[in-house]
UniProtKB/Swiss-Prot annotation:
NCBIfam families named among the record's database cross-references: glmS, PRK00331.1
Protein name: Glutamine--fructose-6-phosphate aminotransferase [isomerizing]
Function of the molecule: Catalyzes the first step in hexosamine metabolism, converting fructose-6P into glucosamine-6P using glutamine as a nitrogen source.
UniProt enzyme class: transferase
MF-aspect GO terms: carbohydrate derivative binding; glutamine-fructose-6-phosphate transaminase (isomerizing) activity
Keyword annotations: Aminotransferase, Cytoplasm, Glutamine amidotransferase, Repeat, Transferase
UniProt subcellular location: Cytoplasm
Catalytic residues in the record: 2, 592
Record organism: Helicobacter pylori (strain J99 / ATCC 700824)
GO biological process: carbohydrate metabolic process; fructose 6-phosphate metabolic process; protein N-linked glycosylation; UDP-N-acetylglucosamine metabolic process
Length: 597
């Protein structure tokens, strides 16, 4: 959610910090700030809104001498978006930035106020600064005082702090929130994402859970688990928008390539392979898939595939529910955690709970150095590449594709799928990749059609079987970027309540599969049409009662239809949001990586 950058060294700090924050900008934020300590002079700058506002504030500033510095992009959790609530938070002698949530901040704040501390913001983070100031009254050693202050915090945090008494060091603390430190020719760098550090450092350390410490240029070498950056391939790809109007449009168009990357080395001569030892999958009798948001919709879709193809019981559970609902597990259960970032707080905590129960665990994520990838028994990378837009497109499609492949691979290992069926599914996967190539005629038709769907009191997205989770995803995509109300439903559920909302001002986006339950879904569409809903049908089969019809190319399988419909719904959401003049890359109130509960 929030982004952290830190730097110790001689180089000009403003450009380093702003460049780092720019790299983290796609995660979502509502304010930004930085602090520099050099020659006993502490300067703090904070602005609300876009990073460009902070850049303007610093237009005539340069920080050339040796010093320590921190920077932050904030996504509001405690306190409204404002300059006062932006990070860094500071006192006369220190400044700090924080990602996460301090759960006991209210009680700590009350204690500190009773001792005479005055607060300038509504945030939980400012409590940490005053807590350290208070602790230093009784503990003279700065590091010990910092450690003692951190020990009083309950919640999740990644913290960077600078202090006038330690002009060559940064202090850090990490618990359930990512923080990485690296060293390069220009000095020591901190960030909440390795992508920020990759071009700048030769060595790096992913800080251990519950670690607290002090870093300078000299003592970096004393850290545990130092890794060499040259051992890892970070492609220097062009992440500019190019000729596209926004990153979301670019990423929709990139899905054909990202799906090919997802299948690279996993699909050879119509046989499926996976980076999981077959012995690990022996005796698996049940699968639990745990995730949030679009990843949850990918999980729901895969339940149909695991049950149908691998002939194994599967269930998808929201990570936030799994943690507290006391679901019963069994010794032969396989737990699959799914998260684009690999740092989603609820999914990460659910994964830890599954590990504590002794379950076999697999993580599906897009980040090889994420916390989830480090604590799972196995990790499968979706290889979707960077998504700059907050709304998930490439990641969702790659998650579904990889889960589909995993269902076939598992069936292969368990002996529940024939060699012929494996070949059929492999061919269907390749056809589905081709289906994700955007045809200009399709995009142009959807662009023209979108102007009809700007006003009304809401949208129903409906589908059956595997197209029900896809309907949920289509509705979420529209909600996220257009701010229009949309709900996804299993088609047959219309009669159980939702149909009461139907009138001429309600739009229905109907996913009509030729290969699965065509007649049943057609009947559900007719029920809505009879009550005057405006019907937009996505199908290869023409339906006369449709008010609008997005005709898809013929598909050889229902999963190929799935990907064709997914692409069309993404384009429809994009064009509606563009007509409404919304910032589709940075929707309001949303963050790319949700690292707090």
């Amino acid at each position: 959610m929030c982004g952290i950058v830190g730097y110790i060294g001689d180089s000009e700090k403003k450009s380093i910090l702003l460049e780092g924050l720019k790299e983290l900008e796609y995660r979502g934020y509502d304010s930004a700030g930085l602090a520099v300590l050099s020659a006993n002079r502490l300067e703090v700058f904070k602005t609300q809104g876009k990073l460009e506002n902070l850049r303007t504030e610093l237009k005539n500033k340069e920080f050339l001498n040796f010093g320590v510095s921190i920077a932050h992009t904030r996504w509001a959790t405690h306190g409204k978006p404002s300059s006062a609530n932006a990070h860094p938070h500071f006192t006369e002698n220190l400044a700090l930035v924080h990602n996460g949530i301090i759960e006991n901040y209210a009680s700590l704040k009350k204690e500190l106020e009773n001792k005479g501390h005055a607060f300038l913001s509504q945030t939980d983070t400012e409590v940490i600064a005053h807590l350290l100031e208070e602790t230093l009254k009784s503990e003279g050693d700065l590091l010990k005082a910092f450690e003692k202050s951190i020990s009083l915090l309950k919640g999740s945090y990644a913290i960077l702090m600078l202090h006038k008494r330690a002009k060559e060091s940064l202090f850090y603390a990490k618990s359930s929130s990512p923080l990485i430190v690296g060293k390069g020719k220009e000095g020591v760098f901190f960030a909440s994402s390795l992508s920020v550090l990759a071009p700048k450092v030769d060595q790096f350390v992913i800080l251990e859970e519950n670690s607290v410490g002090q870093i300078s240029l000299e003592n970096f070498k004393d850290l545990n688990n130092i890794e060499n950056m040259k051992d890892y391939a970070f492609e220097n790809k062009d992440y500019s928008k190019g000729n596209f109007r926004n990153y979301l449009e670019k990423e929709i168009y990139e899905q054909h390539s990202s799906l090919l990357e997802c299948l690279e080395g996993r699909l050879e001569a119509l046989s499926v392979y996976c980076e999981i030892d077959p012995e690990f999958l022996e005796n698996v009798s049940e699968i639990t898939l745990c995730s949030c948001g679009s990843s949850y919709h990918a999980s729901l879709a895969s339940v149909y595939l695991f049950e149908r193809l691998a002939k194994i019981r599967a269930r998808a559970i929201l990570a936030s529910e799994y943690r507290y609902a006391h679901f019963k597990s069994n010794p032969n259960e396989l737990f699959i955690a799914i998260s684009q970032s690999g740092e989603t707080a609820d999914t990460l905590e659910a994964l830890k709970l599954a590990k504590a129960q002794g379950l076999k665990t697999i993580s599906l994520c897009n980040a090889p150095f994420s916390m989830m990838s480090r604590i799972s028994d196995h990790t499968l990378l979706i290889r979707a590449g960077v998504e700059r837009s907050v709304a998930s497109t490439k990641a969702f499609s790659s998650q579904v594709m990889l889960l589909w492949l995993l269902s076939v691979y598992l069936g292969k290992q368990l002996g529940t799928i024939s060699k012929e069926e494996e070949r059929i599914q492999a061919k269907n996967m390749l056809n589905s990749v081709k289906a994700m190539k955007v045809e200009p005629k399709l995009h142009e038709k959807i662009k023209r059609l979108s102007k009809r769907y700007l006003h009304g009191h809401g949208f129903f997205y409906i589908g059956r079987d595997v197209f029900y989770p896809l309907a949920l995803e289509g509705a979420l995509k529209l909600k996220e970027i257009s701010y229009l109300h949309a709900e996804g439903y299993a088609s047959a559920e219309m009669k159980h309540g939702p149909i009461a909302l139907v009138d001429s001002n309600l739009f229905t986006i109907a996913l009509l599969s030729k290969h699965l339950l065509f007649d049943k879904t057609k009947s559900n569409i007719e029920e809505l049409s009879a009550r005057d809903s405006t019907i937009c049908v996505l199908s290869s089969e023409i339906l006369e009662i449709a008010d609008d019809f997005i005709q898809l190319e013929e598909s050889e399988s229902y999963m190929e239809e799935f990907f064709r419909m997914n692409l069309a719904m993404q384009l429809l959401a994009l064009e509606i949001a563009m007509r409404l003049n919304h910032d589709v890359d940075h929707p309001r109130n949303l963050a790319k990586s949700v690292t707090v509960e």
